[in-house]
Amino acid sequence: MKILPKLERKLRRLKKRVTRTSLFRKLDLVHESARKKAFQESCETYKNQIENEYEIRNSLPKLSRSDKEAFLSDGSFHQAVGRVLLVAEFFAMMPVKGVTGKHPSDLSFSWRNIRTCFSLLFIASSLANFGLSLFKVLNNPISFNSIKPIIFRGSVLLVLIVALNLARQWPQLMMYWHTVEKDLPQYKTQLTKWKMGHTISMVMLLGMMLSFAEHILSMVSAINYASFCNRTADPIQNYFLRTNDEIFFVTSYSTTLALWGKFQNVFSTFIWNYMDLFVMIVSIGLASKFRQLNDDLRNFKGMNMAPSYWSERRIQYRNICILCDKMDDAISLITMVSFSNNLYFICVQLLRSLNTMPSVAHAVYFYFSLIFLIGRTLAVSLYSSSVHDESRLTLRYLRCVPKESWCPEVKRFTEEVISDEVALTGMKFFHLTRKLVLSVAGTIVTYELVLIQFHEDNDLWDCDQSYYS
């Protein structure tokens, strides 16, 4: 009888345990479902938040040059020379549309374009200015020194006309240039792609800065000259009367004509310097294409290469030579004007250096101008001759071909390099090689010795003469 109460108590305890466990399980399931629901809601909230942020980020306007590709150079001449031509367009030269485009196919020329109209308007203005200068010179005693305004303005007018004709050919020239570049061995690094464009930009920047400095010094010297030879009480009017004397030689003073003369002088000075820079820039581009081919030949120097390799490189070399001929035909007149112009002005400046300088400002301007002129002429000669130097450098690598790899293609390639005279020319009268530097120097010395025999010490600030004569 005592066993039954004990058994009953045990059954009660067991029933409580079973009941309590099932309750806990139900509670656990409820809690688990609540946790899952809360987790899903938090995930949905987070997902919606991310999507909203993504939509907001995409809705913001993107900058056109924010992409990485916009800052990388493709190594093409078209891209490297784009900004240079853009500056030239501001000064009424090379009126070509699309010079800053990514591909040469963006280039176009039209007579109805505003760039072309501006260029034609400035050509007409330069023609009128040249006519006034010619009239003044012919109505005064003519000397080697007095024809400076005619040489200066005549060369500027000629370069403007040639540049307008070159602008018509430029899209086709750049398309052919792009075709040649595409077939060449590709650049290995971004640095090699960037090098040509960087060199062109630095040459343009340095040339324009020195040209601007020369013009500022010229203005300071002209102000001193105008104050020394004052015709009127107004210093500004006196300055324009002295610096634009070819205009007021045939008409009375006018503020409009004075501003037109100053505008003409500033633009003409830029164009006079730009024609040298343009020859240098084209030379840098052509020389870099030969260098691109030579770098590939240097990488395989002394190795046994298949005949197909030499055949491909020979065709690439021939294409660059054809490109040089096309560019030379297009710019040879500019090259001729550049060298003849520099030769004349160096002779004139050296002859004037024998005279006594009337002021410190004039002396600073004169010697800065002379050094800049000689340096610019030397730079044009050396950069232009680099085309010939790079074309001949190919022969050095061909002579290192092993005996086992010697084949008719290598022999043919070598004969082409030896027999061809690859260089820019001045209308086919002379080739721009390193020998030309010595020839020009010898010519200047010869002319200078002859001119010294007839030289007379003159007053550089003769108020009866033009400031620029």
From Swiss-Prot:
Subcellular location: Cell membrane
Family: Belongs to the insect chemoreceptor superfamily. Gustatory receptor (GR) family. Gr5a subfamily.
UniProt membrane topology term: Multi-pass membrane protein
Gene Ontology BP term (one): signal transduction
Segments on the Extracellular side according to the record's topology features: 139-146, 221-265, 352-353, 457-469
Topological domain ranges for the Cytoplasmic compartment: 1-117, 168-199, 287-330, 375-435
Highest taxon above the source species: Eukaryota
Taxonomic lineage of the native organism: Eukaryota, Metazoa, Ecdysozoa, Arthropoda, Hexapoda
One Pfam family recorded for the sequence: Trehalose_recp
Name listed for the protein in its UniProt record: Gustatory receptor for sugar taste 64f
Expression across tissues: Expressed in Gr5a-expressing sugar-sensing cells.
